[in-house]
């Protein structure tokens, strides 16, 4: 948030339900709120950009929150930027992750919530040069969002995931230096 504010000389507001994380952000000079309803109640105008970086997978109702952002927070020509872990690239489940996303399921969730995807990118930065660990999306509100969107189920998810993880493990053995990059100290 701070990097976006500095780079674009923009006003930013963060939402963080965790007291310790919110206090840390506030100590760095960021304007932070506790919840989405608090943000909606305090915001007189809509945002040009809403960023959800590693947030969506923690929400009990990701499509509902995406809809709420669409209808109550995002400007009509605004941008939604989000990133989630790629379900096909990770061996284990995170207990704090209430939802898992593949490229297909993320597209379906965004379509159901009334967004048009401008770009969907898979990447490994900053952890890997080889593996597509994360899904990054840039989207905008649809001009005519569907009123009764029927989700298209993804087929063969267990098989796709098993094959992706086997391929990842093989690549890691063949090229370990590019597979897992060291975490940079700050």
Language-model region placement:
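Conserved SAM-binding loop
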Residues: 1-113, 123-125, 139-141
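Rossmann-like AdoMet/SAM-dependent catalytic core
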Residues: 52, 103-186
């Amino acid at each position: 948030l701070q990097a976006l504010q500095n780079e674009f000389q923009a006003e930013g507001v963060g939402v963080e339900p965790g007291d310790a994380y919110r206090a840390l952000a506030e100590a760095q000079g960021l304007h932070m709120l506790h919840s989405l309803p608090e943000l909606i109640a305090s915001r007189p105008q809509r945002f040009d950009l809403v960023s959800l970086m590693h947030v969506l997978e923690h929400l009990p109702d990701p499509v509902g929150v995406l809809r709420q952002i669409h209808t109550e927070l995002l400007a009509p020509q605004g941008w939604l930027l989000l990133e989630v872990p790629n379900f096909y690239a990770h061996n284990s489940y995170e207990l704090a992750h209430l939802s898992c996303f593949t490229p297909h399921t993320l597209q379906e969730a965004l379509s159901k919530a009334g967004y048009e995807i401008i770009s969907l990118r898979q990447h490994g930065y900053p952890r890997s040069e080889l593996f597509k660990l994360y899904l990054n999306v840039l989207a905008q509100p649809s001009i005519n969002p569907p009123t009764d969107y029927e989700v298209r189920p993804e087929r063969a998810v267990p098989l796709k995931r098993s094959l992706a993880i086997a391929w990842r493990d093989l690549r890691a053995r063949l090229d370990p230096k590019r597979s897992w990059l060291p975490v940079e100290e700050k």
